[in-house]
Amino acid sequence: MTSHRKHLVRDFNHFITCFVCKGYLIKPTTVTECLHTFCKSCIVQHFEDSNDCPKCGIQVHETNPLEMLRLDNTLEEVIFKLVPGLREKEQQQEDEFWRRKESNDENGPMCKKRRVDEEDDDKGDGDYHRSDPQIAICLDCLRINGQMGENIVKGLMKKFIRCSTRVTVGTIKKFLSLKLKLPSSYELDVLCNGEIMGKDHTMEFIYMTRWRLRGENVYPMVLEYRPRIDFG
């Protein structure tokens, strides 16, 4: 008769805890250069002051180590299944963070008109918001004189939207193509602070790693779009 050994959560701690904070991995994020994994917030904060992996010391990237990070959704699901109640606790903390962030930032004088515009948008389009944390975004058309396609890509009549923090740049591109009635083959670039964003980047990732690091930036986050430029 085969005997089955029971494993405790602590048997797996080496694989599911963060080297930086020593807690369970929250939004596990892997450094592609060395394959070490950390909490997303821990590694992003570490890279504000260093370009080296905090565990092995290897230089991740000379100028922008954030480009070498990849979320590990599979590991996140494994951790949530191993640790009872962790998913609910993390979701509650995340919801509270975004509610507090939006409340604090939108009280500023520069944001009052934007908030009114967002409310008008909601009245016109209905409330299709998901139950997960929301983020307000301003979508600005980036105009470059003489660029091909500038007559096709226009500014939106209602440029303020509210969406899930988990929405990706790819989804934003589809939204823009639909609103601007662009051909299915037409491609756009989406930028934050002048940097082209990858299609798999989420709004939360962009906010945390690009937008909030600029002290002069206010809420809501501004993303710019333009006809795609082929540098090849």
Swiss-Prot record:
- Which keywords has UniProt assigned to this entry? Metal-binding, Nucleus, Repressor, Transcription, Transcription regulation, Zinc, Zinc-finger
Q: Which SMART domains match?
A: RING
Record-level Gene Ontology MF annotations? zinc ion binding
Q: Where are the zinc fingers (RING-type)?
A: 18-57
Provide the protein name.
Polycomb group RING finger protein 5-B
A GO biological process this protein is involved in? regulation of transcription by RNA polymerase II
Tell me which GO cellular component terms the UniProt record holds: PcG protein complex; PRC1 complex
In residue numbers, the region (Disordered) covers: 93-128
Location relative to the cell: Nucleus
Please, which domain of life does this record's source organism belong to? Eukaryota
The organism named in the record is Danio rerio
User: Self-association or partners: how does it assemble?
Assistant: Component of a PRC1-like complex.
Q: What does this protein do?
A: Component of Polycomb group (PcG) multiprotein complexes; the complex class is required to maintain the transcriptionally repressive state of some genes.
Q: Which PROSITE patterns match?
A: ZF_RING_1 (PS00518), ZF_RING_2 (PS50089)
Q: List the biased-composition ranges (Basic and acidic residues).
A: 93-104
SUPFAM superfamilies reported in the protein's UniProt record: RING/U-box (SSF57850)
Q: Which PANTHER family match?
A: POLYCOMB GROUP RING FINGER PROTEIN (PTHR45893)
What's the name of its gene? pcgf5b
